[in-house]
A protein has these predicted regions:
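Active-site core segments that coordinate phosphate-bearing ligands/cofactors
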Residues: 2-10, 14-15, 38-260
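A conserved helix-loop-beta module that forms one wall/lid of the active-site cleft
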Residues: 10-31
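Short beta-strand-loop/turn "lid" adjacent to the catalytic site in phosphate-handling enzymes
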Residues: 1-3, 27-28, 33-38
Length: 263
């Protein structure tokens, strides 16, 4: 799809030998798409979005300059750039945030491949703790002068490096290093990776004053504070951490002309 004019690209279709008339109609994010009978009855489909676009909507980022960062298996930071495509000079992705009533809002996106999945690695592979939330207490009780650094590049590095061959490493280990110190280093690493994306957005001319966060990791209040300190930015927490589901519900309700008051 050509995001500049929100239509299928004849050039790409010809290159890939795809008949353009076989592709579906491009519609609003909230629209009448049809019905499904997957669950035994007719269910109306009235909203469609990618997961990060849904989270952008669920966090209420409807104005240019508003941004959200979702911390689940990975981390995905997305910035509403308004009605015009903004091409990044810092290797961020230009994409469509949503289209409502024929009006498109574009976005910049940066991805961190491993966030919550790195916490799971400490839990499952190194058996640091029996459940992921326990990393909070370990990190709180770490030696803040341990100088341990963690690079969680288990599956490469995302934005702005885009290096699929990069691999993880832990530096600064000594005989005094504890699992508490390594846990602290991991939370710091996720925050600093977020800062990489934040600085890319800043260099692209965006002056962020705050960042809305969501996802499973935001239950870790200690991580949220690390993030605020590293970014030197106001961090805004949602009433419901599942912003992606909230955004999908918003679009489905809007497309069905239902009340949005309880979403």
């Amino acid at each position: 799809m050509d995001i500049n004019n929100v239509s299928w690209s004849e050039e790409m279709c010809n290159l890939l030998n795809i008949p353009i008339n076989r592709l579906p109609e491009i519609k609003n994010s909230a629209d009448e798409y049809g019905e499904t009978s997957l669950f035994g009855g007719k269910i109306k489909i009235s909203g469609i979005a990618g997961d990060q676009q849904a989270a952008l909507i669920g966090q209420g980022c409807f104005k240019a300059g508003e941004a959200k960062s979702t911390y689940g298996t990975g981390c995905f930071m997305m910035l509403n750039t308004g009605p015009d495509v903004k091409l990044s000079k810092s290797k961020l992705l230009s994409t469509i945030g949503y289209q409502i009533d024929g009006k498109v809002s574009y976005a910049l996106e940066g991805s961190i491949f491993m966030a919550g999945a790195s916490v799971q690695w400490l839990r499952d592979n190194l058996e640091f703790f029996p459940s992921a939330p326990e990393i909070e207490n370990l990190a709180k009780n770490s030696n803040k002068n341990s100088n341990v650094s963690f690079i969680p590049a288990f599956t490469g590095l995302g934005a702005p490096y885009w290096d699929p061959e990069a691999r993880g490493a832990i530096f600064g280990l000594s005989r005094e290093t504890t699992k508490n110190d390594i846990s602290q280093a991991l939370l710091e690493a996720i925050a600093f990776q977020t800062k990489d994306i934040f600085e890319c957005m800043s260099s692209d001319g965006v002056d962020l004053k705050s960042l809305k966060i969501d996802g499973g990791m935001v239950e870790n209040k200690y991580f949220n504070q690390i993030l605020a300190d590293v970014l030197n930015l106001k961090i805004l927490l949602p009433d419901n951490k599942e912003a992606t589901a909230k955004g999908a519900a918003f679009l489905a309700s809007l497309g069905s002309n239902l009340s949005l008051i309880h979403i």
